[in-house]
Amino acid sequence: MQHKTIMDKIIIQGARENNLKNIFLEIPKNQFVVFTGLSGSGKSTLAFDTLYAEGQRRYLESLSSYARQFLDKVGKPNVDKIEGLTPAIAIDQKTTSKNPRSTVGTITEIYDYLRLLFARVGEQFCPTCLEPISSMSASDIISQICHLEENSKIIILAPIIKDKKGSFNDKLESLRLKGYVRAFVDGVMVRLDEEIHLHKTKKHTIEAVVDRVVINSENAYRIASAVEKALKESYGELEVEILQDNAPSIRKHYSEHKACFKCKMSFEELEPLSFSFNSPKGACESCLGLGTKFSLDISKILDPNTPLNQGAIKVIFGYNRSYYAQMFEGFCAYNGIDTALCFNELNKEQQDALLYGNGTEISFHFKNSPLKRPWKGIIQIAYDMFKEQKDLSDYMSEKTCSSCKGHRLKASSLSVQVAGLKMADFLTKPIEEVYHFFNDPTHFSYLNEQEKKIAEPILKEILERVFFLYDVGLGYLTLGRDARTISGGESQRIRIASQIGSGLTGVLYVLDEPSIGLHEKDTLKLINTLRNLQKKGNTLIVVEHDKETIKHADFVVDIGPKAGRHGGEVVFSGSVKDLLQNNHSTALYLNGTKKIERPKFEPPKEKHFLEIKNVNINNIKNLSVQIPLKQLVCITGVSGSGKSSLILQTLLPTAQTLLNHAKKTQSLNGVEIVGLEHLDKVIYLDQAPIGKTPRSNPATYTGVMDEIRILFAEQKEAKILGYSASRFSFNVKGGRCEKCQGDGDIKIEMHFLPDVLVQCDSCKGAKYNPQTLEIKVKGKSIADVLNMSVEEAYEFFAKFPKIAVKLKTLIDVGLGYITLGQNATTLSGGEAQRIKLAKELSKKDTGKTLYILDEPTTGLHFEDVNHLLQVLHSLVALGNSMLVIEHNLDIIKNADYIIDMGPDGGDKGGKVIASGTPLEVAQNCEKTQSYTGKFLALELE
C-alpha cells in the first residue's frame, strides 16, 4: 500500500530553500498541477529550485564518475526528502537562443525535415532561366547527338578547364601525352604541338577536341566512342559544336550530371546539406547563411538637418578625428561650400561630391604640415576608417542580404521546388498556412509511387510538429523567424510544442507562466495543448497566475500568504472546487469577492494626442493612429497582430530619435509623429535583465548601493582604517574577495554539460574579504545588508532618508520581497521591468514623460496587479503618459483608453480594429469583430 502511495504522488518533506518554511506537500502524479501565489511567495523556489533542481541532481548522479566528481560542489536543495520524483524537464521563459543562425524551424527541427523532403523529392530548376534541370545517361546523349540533322558536321569536345585563372601548362602537356591533337583555348582552335602561352592571372577555358565527325548512320559507332571518351575525360560533361556553312556554329551542352543545357550550368546532386545555411554546400556565399549583412548606414553617418560645421557628419566629428576634419574643411573651401548650411540645403552636385567624392586633390594642414590628398567622399572615408579602427559599429546597420534576399541559401538551393513551392515560401508563410498546406494531401498527388513512399514519413513528421506550434497559438509566426526576436512566452510555447512532438512519458514538466504573451482567445488552445502533454502520462507543474489556467487545473497549490519572509507556506492545496470556497487572496479574486479596480483620479482637462502617420513595417501597411496623452492607454490584440511592430519598432525609436536630437522635422524614415511638443522624453521599460553578471543586483541598478557604501565609509572604524566608499564595492580590488572577484560564486566548466556555479569557499558567497566585513552599521556588515529583503532593508535604514526613499519605490512596485544583493541573472523579466520602473519613480518627475511598458503584469499575482495598477495611475496623475502593451484584462478594463489591433495575427492583422474607452470597445465588439472587446464585455458584465 505504501508503495502505491509513493508511485501515485510526489511527496515533499521539509522544503526550506530560500523563504520556504519547512513545507510538507503531496502532489498527485500524471495530473495538471498549478502553483500560484503572490510574486515572491516561493512558487518558483518550490517548483524550480527544489523539485526540478533535485530531479537534475539525481540525473547527474546517474552519469559517469567524471561528472560525479563535481556533485559535492553542486548544492543539494534544502529539503529533507522528496519521494516519487520522476525525471524532470524545465521549460522556462529564458530566450531560446542568442545565435543568429537559430530560427523557429531549426529549434523545432521542422527545418531538418524540410531539408530532407527537398533533398529527396525536390524538383530542381535553373536559378537563371527557371527551366527544369535534368540529367542524361551516356546512351541518352549518344542518341540525341546521332539524331542531329543528317550530314551535319560536328566537333565533340571534352571541357577540361572552365573559366579559371592559371597558365595550365601541365594540363596542356597531359592532353598532348594522351594523344589529343587539337583543343579549343578561349574559343579558338589551336594545335597542341605548338607553343601555347596563357596569362596566369587571367581566366581561361580549355576544351579538348575528341573527334570531328559527320552525322550519319555509318559514323554511329564512332560518335558513341567519342562521346564515351569525352565524358570520361571531363567527368561526365561534353560540348558539341555544330558547324554551319554560312552561319555561326551552334554549341550544345550535355551532362551525365544534373544540368541546365540552356545556360550550360551543372548542378550537384541534392542532399539535406544543400538546404542547410550552416553548411558551405547550402549557405549563401554572400552572407554565409545569416540572411543579413552589416553595412554603413548613411542616416547614421550624416544628419541632413544639422549645419555641416556643427557636427552634421558624425563619422568625422563624432570621433574627434582631426585629420579627416581638416581634410573636410579643405574640401568645402575648395568647392565653395558654406559649412553653415545643412546637407539638405546643398545642391545635388555638392551633395554627391560630399558623399562619393569627385577626385579633386584637396590642400589642407594637419599638425602644422601642408598636405595634399584626393577627396574620396564621406562614405569611402567611413569604410577606410572602419578597416583601420574597427570602432564604427554605431554607424553600421544590419540589412537584408541582397544576394539571397534574406533567405540564407544559395540560388541553386532556393530554386528547388516541392509541390510548386520553394524553401523560402515555406519559411516565410505563417505557420497556420504551412499547417493547412501540409494537411492537404492533394498538394503531393503529383509524386510518383516511389516518391510518395519516400515522402510519406517525412510529411507525417512535418505535419505533426507544425500542428503542435499552431495548436499552442503560434500560427502567426514563420518557420524562418529569427530566434533572437522571439519573446520569452513564445520561446516557452515553442519548447512545449517540441516536447509534445518528442513523445516522452513519465516525465515531470515544470513550466513558468506559459500563458505570458497570449491573448485570452488563445489561452484555451494552450490549456488543451498542456492537457495533451499530461495525457501522455506526464506530470505538469505550472507556475501560473492566469485565471483560466488555474480554473482548468486538476490540483492547485497556493503559496503565501504574502511575499518574501511573509510567504513560503502552503496556504492551500487541493481541487479548484475546494479552492473557490477558500478565503485567502487567490480564491477571493477567483470567486469574485475581491476585484481589481482603478484608483480615483481626475482626468486631464486638456486633451492632447500623439499621432503616428504612415507606418509601414512587418504586417502593418500605411497605418495612422492617434494615442491620447496624459492617460493610461492599453495596446491590445492577439499575438502577432502588430502591437510590438507599431509601438516598439516604430513609435519608440522614432520618437526617441526626434526628441533626443531636437529635430526640426517631425518625421523619420517616412514615419511622421505629430504632438511631440507635449513630451520631453520617452522611456521604454522592457523586461531585459538589469545586468548580465553576478555582480549586478537591484541595489547597484537603482543606485541605493552608492548611498549604502557611503554610509559604511562614514563609520568610525572605517575612517580609522582609511576606508573610502570604494572599499565596499565588489567591482574593484580592495574590499572584495579576490578568489571569486566579488561574484560570490565560482564557475566550474563541465565541458559536456552546462557550466555550474558553486559558492566561493573563501568568502562563502559574501563577496567581500574578512577585513571589509568587520565594518558594521547597527551591527550589520555590508554582506548582511545585501542579504536583506527590500522590506527588511527599508525598516533597517528608516532613519537614513537617502537610502529609504529609493527602497520605498521598490516596495511601491511590489518588490519588497527581493533581496538587495540578488543576482540580476536570477530575476524574472517582470521583476527586472519593475526594478526599472522603481528607478524611474525615484527620479525627479517633469510630468511630460511617455512611459512605454511591454506586458508589465508578467509574473504578477492578482494582488500584485492591483498594486501595479495604482503605481501606473499615480504616474499618469502627475501628468505623464502611460502606453502599455497588455493582454491582462484586469489592466485593460481599468485603462483610460484602448487601441485594439487585429483582427488576427500575421497577414490577417496589422490594423486598428477598435479604439476608445474599455466600455466603448466592449459595446462595439460585434461590429468591430474585436476579440479583446468580446472578452472585455464578459469581464465588465
Where are these regions (language model features)?
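Conserved phosphate-binding elements of NTP-dependent enzyme cores
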Residues: 1-941
